[in-house]
Amino acid sequence: MARSLVLGNGRFLINFDDFYRIRDVYYPHIGIENHTEGRPFRFGVWVDGATHWVDEVWEREIGYEEGTLVGRTVLRHRALGLELRCRDAVDFEADIFCRELEVRDLRGAARHVKVFLHHDFYISGSDV
């Protein structure tokens, strides 16, 4: 499967698929130890009493900020009336993955939204 977003610094590499799920985490040797074993890490929200994982229902715009290696993703769920704006990067010097997330309500109402990140690591090929 092709990767829609690739972020790395030569030692630490994170790849995202078409649904904005992390599919690969390589560290400290890119191409040798994939700490996900190719299994997706899910990303979703809890709103209005239910959890919604990012899937085919969400509209997705996945790309890079112009002239950078910073990922820029917009996720929209029309039925929920939510838009998520995400910026992702791997630091060039420190092996750190950073994510900035902005939640926008498209209905014009104040609502309580929780963000869920489901990470299922396989460190060095071991089910952790």
Question: Where are the regions a protein language model picked out?
Answer:
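Terminal accessory carbohydrate-recognition/targeting modules of carbohydrate-active enzymes
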Residues: 1-128
